[in-house]
């Protein structure tokens, strides 16, 4: 069994992600962090899923059993956990969330003492410890060496200050009307608060979590409500977060969703014009639209590509000395202000762009033409090795010969195959997509 996917440990709560597994994962991670411990403290936060209570208690049990002290801060965005872990000088931070997934799923994400997500090599070390029963048994403490846990409810203020510091001091949102969809998730308190404190008039949607309604027909993956509300209330902008508020989808004043690659291009160019972009370029992923390449080139900037996942984006950013990158899906990293994707930091930079340029979102956030692109997610029974699927090489070669860019990969968190095609000829692209879907349905679900 493999524990870690593309973004921590994730699965259905109570079946894969049981209390027992959560406790053991926490013990394994704690054993790893103990070897490098400075403060003997680990921070634990969560989103608004009902199963978060079960998993949080299991994690606290596992960590205190091996002698760690635990600080519990309740529902907070994933980027807040990264920030507060470093701010409170903890050895590590743990976020309990399945991000954009529905309430049935949950997950466990780890951050080191600097607020960075763990590299794959560290995750592999933790997996080894997880499966080593003797190491787990030997690490358990007794008597006065057992750790303690305490809950702190006022750390939200630290994160709000950090968010406000990311917004230019010479600007105010006092003339802005904003619709915010909090996805009934971890950003339901901090999102409205920071926008209102910066002066905006905020219409808030889906900010009443009940443990089951997180991401339920709302948030970054379900934008119907925010789009309609922007038009209804004549708002300047719509902001849709996902369940743990590490990604954002922006809606213009006409109620139309802004493409994620367009957003990256607009923000990257804005930072370059202001002289705040470092490294001479931006980082995106292998799934980004080729139109973004053309736009960056026209601006005299480089576009570096990483594998999918904001952790991989950040690794390339560090390697190339770049402070801005992101994914088409809405994960945007501005490393001057955040160690991971941060939906609220990103939204504040969009608002700064609109105020500095005095432009409407519909114009400012669509600076280039996108190539026609289509992404289809195919549910699969098993994840066969792609290189071993008969006839696939020939199919991909045919796409190459006909000018169709392609990316085929399995989801790291779900039983799905993602097929992305891109071509200047939309009709050709759609025809080939129909063929590819039929091919994979037979190859993987027969």
Swiss-Prot record:
It catalyses: alpha-D-glucosamine 1-phosphate = D-glucosamine 6-phosphate. GO terms for cellular component: cytosol. InterPro entries: A-D-PHexomutase_a/b/a-I (IPR005844), A-D-PHexomutase_a/b/a-I/II/III (IPR016055), A-D-PHexomutase_a/b/a-II (IPR005845), A-D-PHexomutase_a/b/a-III (IPR005846), A-D-PHexomutase_C (IPR005843), A-D-PHexomutase_C_sf (IPR036900), Alpha-D-phosphohexomutase_SF (IPR005841), GlmM_bact (IPR006352). GO terms for molecular function: magnesium ion binding; phosphoglucosamine mutase activity; phosphomannomutase activity. Mg(2+) binds at residues 99, 242, 244, 246. It is an enzyme of class 5 (isomerase). This is Phosphoglucosamine mutase. It comes from Sulfurimonas denitrificans (strain ATCC 33889 / DSM 1251).
């Amino acid at each position: 069994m493999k524990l870690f996917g593309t973004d921590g440990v994730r699965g259905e709560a109570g079946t894969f992600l049981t209390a027992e597994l959560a406790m053991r994962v926490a013990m394994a991670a704690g054993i790893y962090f103990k070897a490098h411990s400075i403060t003997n403290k680990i921070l634990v936060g969560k989103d608004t899923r009902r199963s978060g209570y079960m998993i949080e208690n299991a994690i606290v049990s596992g960590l205190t059993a091996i002698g760690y002290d635990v600080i519990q801060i309740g529902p907070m965005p994933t980027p807040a956990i990264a920030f507060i872990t470093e701010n409170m000088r903890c050895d590590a931070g743990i976020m309990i969330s399945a991000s954009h997934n529905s309430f049935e799923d949950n997950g466990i994400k780890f951050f080191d003492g600097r607020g960075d997500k763990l590299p794959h090599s560290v995750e592999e070390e933790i997996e080894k410890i997880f499966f080593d029963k003797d190491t787990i048994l030997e690490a358990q403490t007794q008597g006065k060496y057992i750790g303690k846990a305490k809950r702190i409810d006022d750390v939200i203020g630290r994160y709000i200050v950090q968010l406000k510091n990311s917004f230019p001091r010479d600007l105010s949102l006092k003339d802005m009307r904003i619709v915010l969809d909090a996805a009934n998730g971890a950003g339901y308190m901090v999102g409205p608060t920071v926008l209102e404190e910066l002066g905006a008039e905020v219409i808030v949607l889906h900010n009443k979590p009940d443990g089951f309604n997180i991401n339920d027909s709302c948030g970054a993956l379900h934008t119907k409500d925010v789009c309609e509300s922007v038009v209804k209330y004549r708002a300047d902008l719509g902001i849709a977060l996902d369940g743990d508020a590490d990604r954002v989808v922006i809606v213009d004043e006409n109620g139309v969703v802004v493409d994620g690659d367009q957003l990256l291009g607009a923000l990257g160019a804005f930072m370059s014009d202001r002289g705040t972009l470092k490294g001479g370029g931006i980082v995106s992923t292998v799934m980004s639209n080729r139109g973004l390449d053309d736009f960056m080139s026209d601006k005299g900037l480089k576009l570096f590509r990483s594998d999918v996942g904001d952790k991989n984006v950040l690794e390339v950013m560090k390697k190339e000395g770049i402070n801005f990158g992101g994914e088409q899906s809405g994960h945007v990293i501005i490393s001057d202000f955040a160690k991971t994707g941060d939906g609220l930091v990103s939204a504040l930079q969009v608002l700064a762009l609109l105020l500095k340029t005095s432009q409407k979102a519909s114009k400012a956030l669509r600076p280039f033409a996108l190539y026609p692109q289509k992404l289809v997610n195919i549910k699969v029974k098993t994840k066969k090795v792609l290189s071993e699927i008969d006839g696939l090489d020939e199919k991909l070669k045919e796409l190459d010969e006909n000018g169709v860019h392609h990316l085929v990969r399995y989801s790291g968190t779900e039983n799905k195959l993602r097929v992305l095609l891109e071509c200047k000829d939309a009709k050709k692209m759609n025809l080939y997509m129909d063929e590819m879907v039929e091919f994979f349905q037979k190859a993987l679900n027969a």
